[in-house]
Amino acid sequence: MSELTNTEKRAVILLSGGLDSATVVAMARAEGYACYTMSFDYGQRHRAELDAAARVARDLGAVEHKVIGLNLNGIGGSALTDSSIAVPESPSEGIPITYVPARNTVFLSLALGWAEVLGARDIFIGVNAVDYSGYPDCRPEFVESFERMANLATKAGVEGQGFTIRAPLQNLSKSDIVKAGAALGVDYSLTVSCYQADDQGRACGKCDSCRLRTEGFTAAGMADPTRYF
């Protein structure tokens, strides 16, 4: 991983190991940020994404990649953290059961803490409100509200060194995201998007995340390097 110099600006980037967050790392790097990536081992059934996140961080030259352990399966309430709840394999009405309660709020809070320690003022997250599953913590209103909270709740914020929550994919279609990442050199074969990925990172091809990914590559006119089981 690359070395940091005192002249470089720092950013903390939430990196799940999926398509969207990998694209965000590449975007931040292209803007000249020294990238500090953060992933979470939160009890998710698709733990293969953690290996993918490490690969992406290494490939895109993150200064440091940090994995935080959380026990969100102790709370449950989601098909991603409770093995007794099946992952839906067809679209459904409303917010799907793959929504993890307060996940992005928790993740951004920990990223905020790390950013304050690092002296970073920008936090990147790969949320999208166009081609997405309808999660409430992916909407622009959430991002804007969290930024306001961040600047009220931190020493840096109240001392005038405010934080910006960057969500560069917010209004892009999935195909636009794929094209943007490809133009920036993202190797999407390193990523894992599937909610039911096996230990080797192979995808089911049936869940909502697989569907959105497949549609994105198809609309972009590009081959999807996803491996399936």
From Swiss-Prot:
Q: In which pathway does it act?
A: Purine metabolism; 7-cyano-7-deazaguanine biosynthesis
Tell me the InterPro entries matching this sequence.
QueC, Rossmann-like_a/b/a_fold
Entry protein name: 7-cyano-7-deazaguanine synthase
Read off the lineage from the record: Bacteria, Pseudomonadati, Pseudomonadota, Gammaproteobacteria, Pseudomonadales
- This protein's UniProt keywords: ATP-binding, Ligase, Metal-binding, Nucleotide-binding, Queuosine biosynthesis, Zinc
Q: Which Pfam families match?
A: QueC
Q: Which reaction does it catalyse?
A: 7-carboxy-7-deazaguanine + NH4(+) + ATP = 7-cyano-7-deazaguanine + ADP + phosphate + H2O + H(+)
- Which cofactors does this gene product need? Zn(2+)
Q: Name one GO molecular function term.
A: ATP binding
Q: Where does ATP bind?
A: L15, S16, G17, G18, L19, D20, S21, A22, T23, V24, V25
Which GO biological-process labels does this protein carry? queuosine biosynthetic process
Q: Which SUPFAM superfamilies match?
A: Adenine nucleotide alpha hydrolases-like (SSF52402)
According to its UniProt entry, the function of this protein is described as:
Catalyzes the ATP-dependent conversion of 7-carboxy-7-deazaguanine (CDG) to 7-cyano-7-deazaguanine (preQ(0)).
- Could you say which protein family the record assigns here? Belongs to the QueC family.
What PANTHER family is this protein classified in?
A: 7-CYANO-7-DEAZAGUANINE SYNTHASE
Q: How is the cofactor bound?
A: Binds 1 zinc ion per subunit.
Q: What is its EC number?
A: 6.3.4.20
